Curated annotation (Swiss-Prot):
The name this protein goes by in its record: Nuclear cap-binding protein subunit 2
Known partners and oligomeric status: Component of the nuclear cap-binding complex (CBC), a heterodimer composed of ABH1/CBP80 and CBP20 that interacts with m7GpppG-capped RNA. Interacts with FRIGIDA; the interaction is direct.
Keyword Cytoplasm: yes
Lineage of producing organism: Eukaryota, Viridiplantae, Streptophyta, Embryophyta, Tracheophyta
Motif window: Nuclear localization signal: 201-207, 254-257
UniProt modified residues of type Phosphoserine: S245
Positions of transmembrane segments: none
Function text: Component of the cap-binding complex (CBC), which binds co-transcriptionally to the 5' cap of pre-mRNAs and is involved in various processes such as pre-mRNA splicing and RNA-mediated gene silencing (RNAi) by microRNAs (miRNAs). The CBC complex is involved in miRNA-mediated RNA interference and is required for primary miRNA processing. In the CBC complex, CBP20 recognizes and binds capped RNAs (m7GpppG-capped RNA) but requires ABH1/CBP80 to stabilize the movement of its N-terminal loop and lock the CBC into a high affinity cap-binding state with the cap structure.
Deleted gene: phenotype: Hypersensitivity to abscisic acid during germination, significant reduction of stomatal conductance and greatly enhanced tolerance to drought. Plants also display mild developmental abnormalities, such as serrated rosette leaves, delayed development and slightly reduced stature.
Tissues and organs where the protein is expressed, per its UniProt entry: Expressed in all tissues analyzed, including roots, stems, leaves and flowers.
Gene Ontology annotations for the cellular component aspect, listed alphabetically: cytoplasm; nuclear cap binding complex; nucleus
Domain (RRM) ranges: 34-112
Length: 257
């Protein structure tokens, strides 16, 4: 009986729930299969890497990568189909536990690939083991899916709380007039905040008024100067003022003498 359990442990470390037969039929399928299941694979391991590694055990018929059923990207497992049973046994014997992309891969006998088994069975699309994993594994998407959802929910709560406080700007104080309790300046503090601006605005109004007054005075002065010039009588060339001398004056003095 002990040898039977030992033989079972050698054939496979897990039982596929999708196998519809009995345990005896499952064990018989494992003994005759030329397919191996590879687990604990990095999401970034390529089909070419797997082919290079498993071709050392024998001639490979086909490699089928396990994919996330939602994103259609590798999700950490694959199937390798050999042509002979001997090569299949060598792969399990010599390659299981090999370090590939800095992680030990697991190689088990498989009862045979069927269409649909290439998709992950987890609720999030990947493998079930990655749903409940609590450790951080950068080669397999970081934390497990449930932990990622919890972290995302916490982040959204933090973002929502920050947004509710910072999304709406604080309303500026309204000027209700200069009442006895501070009025529009909200008391002494309001004067400290707004008094400087009021001073500059008043100074600017005074400067503008002073400039307009100067301009008006200059304009009035020029107008009065022009008016005085216009009102001053023009000299008649026929009349002379005292002290003037010309030839007609000399003629008068000659006649008197």
């Amino acid at each position: 009986m002990a040898s039977l359990f030992k033989e079972q442990a050698k054939l496979s470390a897990y039982r596929d729930r999708r196998f519809s037969g009995t345990q005896e039929e499952f064990d018989e399928a494992l003994r005759a299969s030329t397919t191996v299941y590879i687990g604990n694979v990095s999401f970034y391991t390529t089909e070419e890497q797997l082919y290079e590694l498993f071709s050392r055990a024998g001639e490979i018929k086909k490699i089928i990568m396990g994919l996330d059923k939602n994103t259609k990207t590798p999700c950490g497992f694959c199937f390798v189909l050999f042509y002979s049973r001997e090569d299949t046994e060598d792969a399990v014997k010599y390659i299981s536990g090999t370090i590939l992309d800095d992680r030990p891969i697991r190689v088990d006998f498989d009862w045979g690939f069927q269409e649909g088994r290439q998709w992950g069975r987890g609720r999030s699309g990947g493998q079930v083991r990655d749903e409940y994993r609590t450790d951080y594994d950068p080669a397999r998407g970081g934390y497990g899916k449930l932990v990622q959802k919890e972290l995302e929910a916490q982040r959204q709560l933090v973002d929502y709380g920050t947004g509710s406080l910072g999304a709406y700007p604080q309303a500026a104080p309204t000027n209700y007039g200069n009442g006895r309790r501070g009025g529009g300046n909200y008391g002494q503090g309001g004067q400290n905040r707004h008094g400087r601006g009021d001073y500059h605005r008043k100074r600017q109004r005074d400067d503008d008024r002073y400039g307009r007054d100067n301009s008006r005075r200059n304009t009035d002065h020029e107008s009065r100067r022009d008016t005085d010039s216009d009102m001053r009588p023009e000299k008649n060339p026929r009349f002379r003022e005292s002290g003037d001398s010309d030839d007609d004056g000399e003629d008068d003095r000659k006649r008197r003498s």
